[in-house]
Regions:
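Short, amphipathic alpha-helical interface elements at domain boundaries
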Residues: 2-72
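A short, conserved structural fragment
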Residues: 89-99
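Minor-groove-contacting beta-hairpin "wing" of winged helix-turn-helix DNA-binding domains
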Residues: 101-108
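Short, amphipathic alpha-helical interaction segments positioned at domain boundaries
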Residues: 110-142, 156-163
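Non-catalytic interaction/clamp surfaces of large macromolecular machines
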Residues: 143-147
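C-terminal regulatory/oligomerization modules of transcriptional regulators
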Residues: 152-172
């Protein structure tokens, strides 16, 4: 699940956090929110939260392992997410909605059927977290979502900094 790269005539698919995987995560969120549409910025934040749901008190275990300084992931997801949305849009699984306040993305009537045939452990966990995410944050305002991110982004992944300090003290 990731970006396809040509390498000396061969095709290589980067398995993690490429357009295919990030687009699939966005599709799961949009499907759970259907028929509501979300902005790209909201989807960037939601992608972070679905991957690192354990950063939210009371959230389910994260879809991916925790990494140091993971809060910075928010800065690099936008472009890849756009590519993923375009990929799924080209298959009529996501649609762009143009409104007075901007461009939004929504699932289509085909999205649920597509997701239903994907039965891997990863997709099952993804869909569970998408339901939790939309249920917990789907209706909060963009301003409140942005405030939550600003208030906590410095904490997300910071536990590794403390862990490395403690480990350094033990070895001395």
């Amino acid at each position: 699940m990731g970006e396809v790269k040509a390498e000396q005539g061969a095709r290589f698919i980067a398995p993690f956090n490429g357009p295919v995987e990030i687009g699939l995560r966005a599709l799961a969120v949009l499907n759970d929110a259907y028929p509501d549409a979300y902005s790209l910025q909201r989807l960037v934040v939601f992608d972070y939260l679905i991957v690192h749901s354990d950063d939210i008190p009371g959230g389910p275990p994260g879809l991916h392992p925790q990494t140091p300084h993971r809060g910075t992931e928010l800065l690099v997801r936008r472009g890849v997410l756009q590519e993923g949305l375009l990929l799924y849009q080209s298959r009529a699984l996501v649609e762009q909605c143009y409104e007075e306040t901007g461009v939004f993305f929504a699932a289509t009537e085909r999205s649920a059927a597509f997701l239903d045939v994907l039965r891997t452990e990863y997709v099952v966990g993804l869909r569970q977290r998408a339901a939790w995410l939309v249920g917990s944050f789907g209706t909060i305002s963009d301003a409140d979502l942005e405030k939550m991110v600003r208030d906590h982004v410095g904490e997300w992944g910071a536990e590794f900094a403390m862990e490395s300090v403690l480990w350094a003290e033990e070895t001395q």
